[in-house]
Amino acid sequence: IETLSDEDVATILDKVFRTDDPEHPGVAAFTAQGRTVISGPIEVLNYSYFEEDFPDTFRTAMTIRSEIAERGWERVVAFQTRNPMHRAHEELCRMAMEDLSADGVLIHMLLGKLKPGDIPADVRDASIRKMVDLYFPPNSVMVTGYGFDMLSAGPREAVLHAVFRQNAGCTHLIV
């Protein structure tokens, strides 16, 4: 920890979520954590329950990057999902691969806390893998997941997710 401060919570809420509405899920989660902001270098001690609960799906960015290199992929399209994929999502991935002459698609699902009523991660994982097996060419898709709770922070969160995919070795992102 480098700094501890009691930053102006209202300023943080405005800059990140563009609202201070306590009903907003991101605002509610942030304000429930208290007023003290901690900053400093990050060191991963463990990956919570994700490694154990999703051993075939959870991957770190470094692991994904290594798998992409092993496959010889240079152009990789990322598709993030917090739900099972439907036919339009499948077609978006195919179109992106074709239009970009991409070597593969990374289907990257969120494994953390989502919206109430969302499909559980194990069900999403099984349905996505079945779709990939049935409808995509062999070795054209990598199905992975990462532990992240939805923030509901709109465009700023979308940029954060794009950075995650870039860190994992993806060159393009479907939004």
Functional labels for PLM-detected ranges:
Residues 2-175:
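Nucleotidyltransferase catalytic core that binds NTPs
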